[in-house]
């Protein structure tokens, strides 16, 4: 990925993605899916049509999925309802429908496009992850969801992310 030598921000995103892969991967485990994700993500970084922030949120969510810690975005985590609208609760681990929301204090109201994006990222094959863009609103909502989710469920402070935050 020689193109990243001339793109400091892209290079630091790459460092961040490698750091996440290092955090999740374990010796003697079958880590092909995570390595495939890392490879496709690095390829996406050199594609100027996809914003780096979107690449970041896609990578974070898919890495969490591969590790088996994905939020439930297809149905209510409390009652299992798939039809009712809901809010995203980090503390509950995903979608909470309008019927079950009364005990939830961290619910985020998400645009239907954001719900669809989360569902697509979780269900798509790694090879098809980086073939779309989103509106600014969806990008902001993805930032909120992934920021909160990473803070609660990923027990690690990534040094490269700290540098990225200073750069952007």
Predicted regions and their residues:
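Non-catalytic alpha-helical scaffolds and adjoining flexible linkers that form interface surfaces
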Residues: 1-168
């Amino acid at each position: 990925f020689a193109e990243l030598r001339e793109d400091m921000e892209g290079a630091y995103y790459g460092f961040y993605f490698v750091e996440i892969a290092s955090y999740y991967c374990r010796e003697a485990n079958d880590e092909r899916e995570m390595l495939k994700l890392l490879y496709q993500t690095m390829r996406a970084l050199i594609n100027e049509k996809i914003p780096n922030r979107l690449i970041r949120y896609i990578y974070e969510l898919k890495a969490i999925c591969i590790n088996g810690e994905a939020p439930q975005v297809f149905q209510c985590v409390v009652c299992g309802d798939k039809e009712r609208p809901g809010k995203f609760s980090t503390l509950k681990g995903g979608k909470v429908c309008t019927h079950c929301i009364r005990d939830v204090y961290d619910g985020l109201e998400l645009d239907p496009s954001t719900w669809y994006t989360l569902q697509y990222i979780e269900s798509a094959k790694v090879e098809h992850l980086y073939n779309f863009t989103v509106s600014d609103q969806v990008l902001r909502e993805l930032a909120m969801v992934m920021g909160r989710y990473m803070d609660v469920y990923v027990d690690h402070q990534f040094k490269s992310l700290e540098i990225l935050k200073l750069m952007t």
